[in-house]
Amino acid sequence: MKLIKYPDRSQWNEILKRPVLETENLFDTVRNIINRVRAGGDRVVMECEAVFDKAELTSLAVTSAEIEEAEKEVPIELKAAIYLAKRNIETFHSAQRFEGKKVDTMEGVTCWQKAVAIEKVGLYIPGGTAPLFSTVLMLAIPAKIAGCKEIVLCTPPDKNGKVHPAILFAARLAGVSKIFKVGGVQAIAAMAYGTESIPKVYKIFGPGNQYVTAAKQLVSLRDVAIDMPAGPSEVEVLADESANPVFVAADLLSQAEHGVDSQAMLVTTSEKLQTEVVYEVERQLGYLTRRDIAEKSLANSKLILVKDMEEALELTNAYAPEHLIIETKDYMEVAGQIVNAGSVFLGAFSPESAGDYASGTNHTLPTNGYAKAYSGVSLDSFIRKITFQEILPSGMSAIGPAIEVMAANEHLDAHKNAVTVRLEEIRK
């Protein structure tokens, strides 16, 4: 961890830089795999699985028998926890349902919106160092609430061709339609273009490593929508002298254990807290099973001391963190001044872990500063809003002349004529 005290504004850009991974040949590699899958379908997907996941597969689909067997392997206490998380996620996302109302913009001119679910969506759930069954809930539950007809899930198998039981349990519970043993770039390509087994979808959701992220970016240029640009996960803790250093250190470490490219930041007005957090991080680090990962991640982490809360807020909004934890005595007032963040956790007893799993909010969030322009996944991510307008003769009489003038001044004669012929009919 790097301790920074009272940085000058000229240093902010350097201080707030995210970890950068080497990507010199990445896009060429990813593009090649995408093109191969697009041309060769299931055969190429299985070849990729053998190379990248060391799994020799004869079929890609997860069977009902496999799901039923997996459910038996999930411990009762984990099932209970998943049920609780599901209930809270459903409650929060159900409250986001759109209720469009008709608006009369003028007499005889009525406009409205209708929310329609995206019919086919694809969910990518990484394998890697941890089974992210929580991400299954975060993506499949709002998709189901939205009314998506087909929810396709791809996740990499282990070398024995098995998918983690908790992922399968969560997928069935959340209403996933089809599950496939496919990971990496090949999974994104398969969902973007379709194979003999895997349906083509209209929008792809889910996190992944730099290869998966690059694949999502490439297929989104023309062929399929994606949830958002994504990068390594990150957290900022914004704290004053009232914060508990044990809690702050725990929050920083909970982010650091995600991956070696994760970033954990503390921005504080208290030099005493900055010092105490360094001690607490070292103490708690010794208890972690993923200590090696956390230690490497902490190399990207910074503990920044600033002169006052005004500067802390300015620095925070410039950073635009994926996760922001506010541990100050007046956290509601401070929160009111946050304009750039993915998800905000207020007060000493609101750790990021709550949002990651079970509070009900979504943990699929914009990273890498994209919180300045993007929202996290919500019910809206799975729907489209179609606009409608009904114009009666009285409405056309009211707005028609203005349309004619505007079209004429844009030199679009056919646009003008489409109104003129109607006005002439009305005047008969």
From Swiss-Prot:
- Per UniProt, Zn(2+) binds at Q255, H258, D356, H415
Q: Which residues form the active site?
A: E322 (proton acceptor), H323 (proton acceptor)
What biological process terms from GO does the record include? L-histidine biosynthetic process
Catalytic activity, reaction form: L-histidinol + 2 NAD(+) + H2O = L-histidine + 2 NADH + 3 H(+)
The record's comment on protein family reads: Belongs to the histidinol dehydrogenase family.
Q: What does this protein do?
A: Catalyzes the sequential NAD-dependent oxidations of L-histidinol to L-histidinaldehyde and then to L-histidine.
Can you say what this protein is called?
Histidinol dehydrogenase
Species the sequence originates in: Bacteroides fragilis (strain YCH46)
Gene name of this polypeptide:
hisD
